Amino acid sequence: GWPAYPGSNGIRSSVCQKKLGCGSKNLASLGVCKAFCLGRKRFWQKCGKNGSSGKGSRICNPVLAHAVEKAGKGLIKVTDMAVATIIKFAG
């Protein structure tokens, strides 16, 4: 299924950046991290709480949603490629 909606505050770019420790932890460069958090916010805005508002959109699928949230929690590495993919679809 779809991952839990982080909430309107939880999808904020600043909250995401703080959670990931953008630029401080050895997770990703500040630029990559900021771009990811912005892409994540756009993703949620576009797809809605359970992907329903993004019906018919390639990006609004549970697999990508789970990947976005795993990266947003710092469970998987935020890479340039991941960011590029998210932004390409959500932008």
Curated annotation (Swiss-Prot):
Signal peptide: none annotated. Localized within the skin and proboscis and are most readily isolated from body mucus secretions. The keyword Isomerase does not apply. Keywords: Cytolysis, Disulfide bond, Hemolysis, Secreted, Toxin. It is found in: Secreted. One of its GO terms (biological process) is killing of cells of another organism. Disulfide bonds join 16-37, 22-33, 47-60. Coiled coil: none annotated. One of its GO terms (molecular function) is toxin activity. One of its GO terms (cellular component) is extracellular region. Cytolysin that shows hemolytic activity (on bovine erythrocytes, HC(50)=5.75 mg/ml). This hemolytic activity is completely inhibited by small unilamelar vesicles composed of PC/PG, PC/PI and PC/PS in 1:1 molar ratios (with at least 100 mg/ml concentration). Belongs to the worm cytolysin family. This is Parbolysin P6. It comes from Parborlasia corrugatus.
